[in-house]
Amino acid sequence: MANTAQARKRARQAVKQNEHNSSLRSKLRTSIKAVRKAIETGDKAAAAKVFAATQATIDKIADKKIAHKNTASRQKSRLSAAIKAMAA
């Protein structure tokens, strides 16, 4: 239990930040699912459009260190490869 006023405040801030970060991670997972769904439908143009928006989301979350930069890079790479493989 937090004993000082500063520790109590930091505990409150940690809870608030955790909720915010959780919502951003959820947004990231939702956008990745949207790209995968677009890939499954077979519409390459739509998949590329959704991927562009998802790529921006992934970058923002990696910049805020909510997701590791290597994880973000791997996700973008795999989604991009899946879109490129649609033509083949």
Curated annotation (Swiss-Prot):
GO-annotated cellular components: cytosol; small ribosomal subunit
NCBIfam families reported for this sequence: S20
BP terms from Gene Ontology: translation
Region (Disordered): 1-29, 69-88
Gene label: rpsT
Molecular-function GO terms, alphabetical: small ribosomal subunit rRNA binding; structural constituent of ribosome
Annotated protein name in UniProt: Small ribosomal subunit protein bS20
Keywords of the record: Ribonucleoprotein, Ribosomal protein, RNA-binding, rRNA-binding
Organism listed in the record: Polynucleobacter asymbioticus (strain DSM 18221 / CIP 109841 / QLW-P1DMWA-1) (Polynucleobacter necessarius subsp. asymbioticus)
InterPro entries in UniProt: Ribosomal_bS20, Ribosomal_bS20_sf
UniProt family annotation: Belongs to the bacterial ribosomal protein bS20 family.
